[in-house]
Amino acid sequence: TKHKIISEIAEKTGLLVQTGGGIRNMETLERVLASGVKRAILGTGAVKDKSFTCRAIEKYNDAIVIGIDAREGMVAVDGWTKSSNNYAVDFAVEMEKIGARTIIYTDISRDGMLKGTELSVLEEMVAKTGMDIIASGGVADFTHVLEAKKSGAAGIIIGKAIYEGKVDLKKCLQNV
């Protein structure tokens, strides 16, 4: 199962693992956290069930990260298949009010495209909240990492660019 694989990764590597996807109730959240992950990412669950999100943050504090996946600034849900009526920055502010401390902001129109991170929404989110905002989506080279850092991002998620050898992770970790 997914949870068994995640548990093995956390146990065998000693890495601090975070995971998301399908966490929409306390039972699933507790199973995920029991598998050895450091942080659980609430995405659609946070958008669709504020009561669940409040309970999760109240009980697990910093182990909860809010994943805001957005297309053209609007929050997407259900595996990116539907857009909501929530503007990403407004939703981040709302999540901060209920106690969230960390956001992973993904511009899904750029995820895996290697075209750089869309900075305007990221910068606005950083400016309007006191949370740690982690940027995700579009990183193609070290310049994009520096741009995200300059915009105020607390961190950045790099995927495809590492797999394809376009970004040297060691260089990023040493220089940012």
Each language-model region and where it sits:
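Alpha-helix-loop-beta-strand connector modules within alpha/beta enzyme cores
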Residues: 1-18, 54-69, 114-141, 176
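Structural motif corresponding to alpha-helix initiation and N-cap regions
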Residues: 3, 26, 47-50, 85-89, ...
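Catalytic cores of alpha/beta
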Residues: 13, 17-39, 120-155, 172
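Glycine- and other small-residue-rich loops at beta-strand/loop junctions that grip anionic moieties
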Residues: 21-22, 42-45, 106, 111-114, ...
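Conserved anion-binding
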Residues: 30-33, 37-111
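C-terminal helical cap(s) of enzyme catalytic domains, especially alpha/beta-barrels
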Residues: 52-59, 64, 149-176
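Short active-site-adjacent structural elements
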Residues: 112-114, 142-145, 164-167
